[in-house]
Amino acid sequence: LEEKIRLESAHKEFLANMETLSDLEYRKEMERLGVDLSWKSSQIEGNTYSLLETERLLKEKQTAQGKTKEEAVMLLNHKDALDFILDNPDYLKELSVRRLEDIHSILTKELGVGNGIRKRRVGITGTNYRPLDNEFQIREALEDTCQLINGKENVFEKALLTLVLLSYIQAFTDGN
């Protein structure tokens, strides 16, 4: 309970601080966050761009030498997904399978990854974990996840549940 109170207080402080930012300051802060999130998320997917190379790509559209086109596309897609979410702040207030699929399609655009819930088995490199392999069970797990998250009030609880459950379900062939 004490931790929950601290988190709620931190969230209120964050919102108050955000209100003091000008539009330009807000955009700059979101740009910085976008670079960090794009870089780290893409690293998890095996991308070899450095943080500095990612920043150059996202800000100046300058690709890094010795890197593949797919790595650049992956990073640019992460930026596009974050921009979409920032430009449509209410879009994910209530999660749905369709909205998750929409964000996934932005993340995987031009990467040769099929859209929609996967229809085949996947493995997680370096683990023995085997996610659900039936499209209907995956959809049901996603629907249950959306319902659970939509029923929560606390933004931190929602974020943690989203991260953990979507990672666990591995609903898409790639780009989870």
Feature-to-residue mapping (PLM):
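FIC/Doc superfamily catalytic core
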Residues: 1-174
